[in-house]
């Protein structure tokens, strides 16, 4: 790793949808009923059969910045080209709406010496203080059990007070449980511009793939973009400093062939093309082939425990990268604890650089009888404009 913050900007799977039901998408279909018109009076014993009208609209979060990385306030429909499965779409609207930001704060980190509750609290308060006026915030902590410490509020001082008075240290935090609780909490926030700021190291043991997949499915229904600030790199560095006594002669590496068995099964239903893209991303390649930066301690049990922790943190880094990747967010890997305030500012700026673009898909889904995945591509048509958005979304047939 280099001596500066590692920040990976990610695309996303599962677009923010207005309407639909199913394991991956929230209601994409809005059904209205109207009376069946008739020129003859209807006998009292007969009821007119209602007609269902499905209104389909995709809400697509798009980040727009200029060549210097600053928010571009001049975005117009003619500046963008949206392709769905290669087919150009007609943009109906571009607007900015207040963000709903759920802080999901891991207060465990019992065996990660770099993970401090005070640092997490300061980071969260900094994010809240830097958000745009009108944004609303809620906060969940998980360090044993998942606990709501602040319900939705548009008053930053209220959220900051709750973070100061209620955030407390725990021992073990289970990320899948926290994701499930977050999806429930996000149902109370308006759709279109929902975010999760996840501060964690992934937990004390390797994240179970089945549990993570279940949590991800629920998050897809909540339409949330996840931004991860990970303590994994800081933790690995700190463990090596504490237990460096005899250098490792031959450091262990993860074979490249393990890419398939380690990464891809997290979401076995991912389309093949997407899986290939993710498999070859530089982040995952680095995480899976980088030598564990370890050292042998003279006390073998201590060394073995530290070695296991290094492996766990590194593996969790992979899952967290996937988590951000699948939801259109980013993962930030601070190298120094002193970087956290600036990272909080950058993250708040990222949240508030987002537009909500809407279009009606040319390939309707109201008559679909099975689940399908649609590929998305958002392209800038204007020189100097940089845009980023989700890469696909999953739709299912509407309930009859």
PLM region descriptions:
Residues 7-10, 33-35:
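Intrinsic structural disorder/low-complexity segments
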Residues 1-6:
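N-terminal secretory signal peptides that target proteins for export/translocation
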Residues 24-400:
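Scaffold/interface architecture of coatomer-like assemblies
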């Amino acid at each position: 790793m280099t001596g500066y913050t590692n920040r990976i900007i990610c695309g996303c799977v599962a677009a923010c949808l207005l309407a639909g039901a199913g394991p991956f998408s929230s209601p994409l279909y809005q059904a209205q009923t109207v009376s069946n018109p008739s020129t003859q009076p209807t006998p009292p014993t007969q009821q007119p059969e209602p007609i269902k009208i499905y209104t389909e609209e995709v809400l697509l979060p798009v980040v727009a910045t200029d060549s210097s990385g600053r928010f571009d306030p001049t975005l117009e429909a003619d500046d963008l080209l949206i392709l769905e499965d290669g087919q150009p779409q007609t943009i109906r609207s571009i607007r900015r709406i207040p963000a709903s930001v759920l802080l999901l704060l891991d207060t465990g980190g019992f065996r990660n010496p770099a993970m401090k509750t005070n640092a997490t609290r300061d980071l969260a308060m900094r994010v809240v203080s830097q958000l745009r006026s009108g944004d609303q915030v809620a906060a969940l902590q998980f360090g044993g059990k998942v606990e709501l410490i602040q319900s939705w509020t548009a008053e930053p001082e209220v959220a900051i007070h709750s973070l100061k008075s209620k955030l407390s240290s725990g021992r073990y935090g289970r990320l899948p449980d926290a994701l499930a609780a977050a999806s429930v909490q996000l149902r109370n926030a308006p759709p279109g511009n929902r975010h999760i700021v996840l501060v964690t190291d992934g937990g004390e043991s390797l994240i179970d793939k089945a549990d993570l997949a279940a949590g991800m499915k629920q998050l897809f229904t909540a339409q949330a973009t996840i931004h991860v600030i990970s303590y994994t790199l800081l933790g690995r560095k700190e463990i090596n400093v504490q237990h460096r006594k005899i250098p490792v002669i031959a450091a262990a590496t993860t074979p490249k062939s393990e890419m398939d068995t380690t990464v891809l099964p997290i979401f076995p239903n991912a389309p093949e093309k997407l899986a290939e893209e993710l498999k070859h991303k530089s982040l995952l390649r680095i995480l899976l082939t980088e030598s564990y930066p370890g050292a042998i301690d003279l006390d073998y049990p201590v060394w073995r425990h530290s070695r296991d922790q290094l492996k766990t943190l590194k593996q969790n880094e992979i899952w967290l990268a996937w988590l951000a990747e699948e939801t259109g967010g980013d993962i930030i890997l601070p190298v120094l604890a002193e970087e956290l305030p600036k990272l909080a500012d950058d993250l708040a700026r990222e949240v508030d650089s987002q537009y909500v673009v809407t279009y009606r898909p040319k390939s309707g889904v109201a008559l679909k009888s099975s689940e399908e995945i649609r590929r998305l591509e958002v392209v800038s048509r204007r020189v100097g404009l940089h845009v980023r958005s989700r890469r696909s979304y999953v739709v299912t047939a509407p309930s009859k």
